[in-house]
Amino acid sequence: MSDNMQPFDETLDDESLDAVDAETTEDCEDVEEFDPFEGMSDEELDALCDEDESLAGFGDVEPGFRSGFVALVGRPNAGKSTLLNACYGKKVAITSPVAQTTRRRMRAVVNRPGYQLVFVDTPGIHKPKDGLGSELNKSALFELNDVDVVAFLIDATKPIGRGDAWVAERVKNARSKKVLVLTKADEADPAQVMEQLKAAHELMEYDDEIVTSSVKNFNVDAFIETVAHFLPEGPRWFPEDMGTDASDETLVAEFVREKVLRRTRDEIPHSVGVICDALEQTKKVLRVHATIYVEREGQKGIIIGKGGEMIKHIGIDARRDLERIFGTQVFLELDVKVKAGWRDDEAQIRRFGYNAED
């Protein structure tokens, strides 16, 4: 147990891929391979070359300064995006009770005295049912050896099953340090937490462990300190004022999709994709146009709603988050279109930005 863990005084409210729990099959998502230089400006990359590929392009390298990447992995709905947001201090990754909410790799940078952490939110590892699911799984598994620490998240409220075991087999073969993170401790009682910890240790060995509750902000700082302990010495990979590597267009698409998921729930979630078509900043307002894509005409009707009421509410919900993120008034225009079978069309998957190699 991590030395950083605090006592929790409140009530703690299926070999092959085919063996994954039916629940896991429904609840899922993936992650993507990334290049730590991807978000750097041309000037920063040029500086690296000018310095004979030394670390000087990052500015002064502080003696003893530590930095690195931490992947948040686990079954769908294990609480990865919620923990990412809690670590960052504000919402950068979308969340919902719907399976497969996370589709894009999302990185959030956390700066603390003496170190910089780059958290990578990944899609839930699951049994894929279509081309999109396969890409998401590839993406998540690629991540395991490209980071310094793998945080394996397990939901404290759900019995550990063969789905967790399948994920654990992949995690334990990674070269990275492994930290067990038991999430949603506020929804479990103490006996349930202890039983989950015991079951988790039967899956694999860990370098450390911690019990958390993101919604109660319980042990979030302790989790950050726990994973930071395993970081190697190195430079700041990203500027101190950079919070996420996601583009404005990506943020728009993701937050609109989140509102669709929350408003429609189980009716059409896996068939929804969103593309931000245009962003135009004027003196007083940010004008945004985005298109919501579904696979069938019936799904389009659900999103539009009777008299346009559903699309209206989706737009209002999304606009509120976008105004908070961009710090300006937002005029959001939404369209809904049908793109049949897009989840099994590689070209369309790439168009939506969900392929593992991007």
Describe each PLM feature range.
Residues 102, 125-127, 159-160, 188-189, ...:
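Catalytic P-loop NTPase motifs of RecA-like helicase/translocase cores
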Residues 3-22, 26-149, 154, 292:
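Conserved G1/Walker A P-loop phosphate-binding module
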Residues 177, 186-248:
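Canonical P-loop GTPase G-domain recognition
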Residues 85, 104, 108, 138-145, ...:
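Solvent-exposed alpha-helical segments within well-ordered globular domains of core cellular machineries
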Residues 248-358:
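P-loop NTP-binding site
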Residues 90, 109-113, 143-150, 203-206, ...:
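Conserved, well-folded catalytic cores of nucleic-acid-processing
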